[in-house]
């Protein structure tokens, strides 16, 4: 998932991350307005890294290798960029796509760039009693193991959705800024510790 050794080399700031665990950002979804109408067919024909199948989806799908991302480019000039591992990378990628569109002869601008969703993950390294957690936090939890193996926890403050797995692996989604991801994890950590599964 993340490059090994990157997170481990810096000591964790315990004032910000009392649990000692910093969630790794896995995917950033951002949007930007190129502020001009686009001929998707022309883009698909001219750009090397683009596919367009209007019967299936009304956008050009374009990919670049660095930062490794995918963009959805709509005729309205709206663009969605997904796959980056940090906010800066997401913005850099979006700028690269905008530049590609400019080079194809469209007067693309770069308006209203916005991070829409940050997905992070981490591992608390201990198993969790999901039934107990779901029972005591019923207002926030849905846990139906026949449908999905994880517990879905909808935190109100910050407004983050957490997927909590028996293994101790956690996925956090819905953040607009990374601090929300970190805060949500610190909020849930004592709860996870409380419902730690004791190995018999």
Swiss-Prot record:
UniProt keywords, alphabetically: DNA-binding, Nucleus, Repeat, Transcription
Record bears the keyword Repeat: yes
SUPFAM superfamilies named among the record's database cross-references: TATA-box binding protein-like (SSF55945)
One GO cellular component term noted in the UniProt record for this chain: nucleus
Resulting phenotype, residue 5 to R: In strain: cv. RTCS 2
Cystine crosslinks: none
GO MF entry, a single one: DNA binding
Pfam families per record: TBP
Sequence repeats: 25-101, 115-192
One BP annotation, GO: DNA-templated transcription initiation
Coiled coil: none
Organism domain of life: Eukaryota
Family: Belongs to the TBP family.
Function comment: General transcription factor that functions at the core of the DNA-binding multiprotein factor TFIID. Binding of TFIID to the TATA box is the initial transcriptional step of the pre-initiation complex (PIC), playing a role in the activation of eukaryotic genes transcribed by RNA polymerase II.
Name the UniProt record assigns to this protein: TATA-box-binding protein 1
Species for this entry: Zea mays
Gene: TBP1
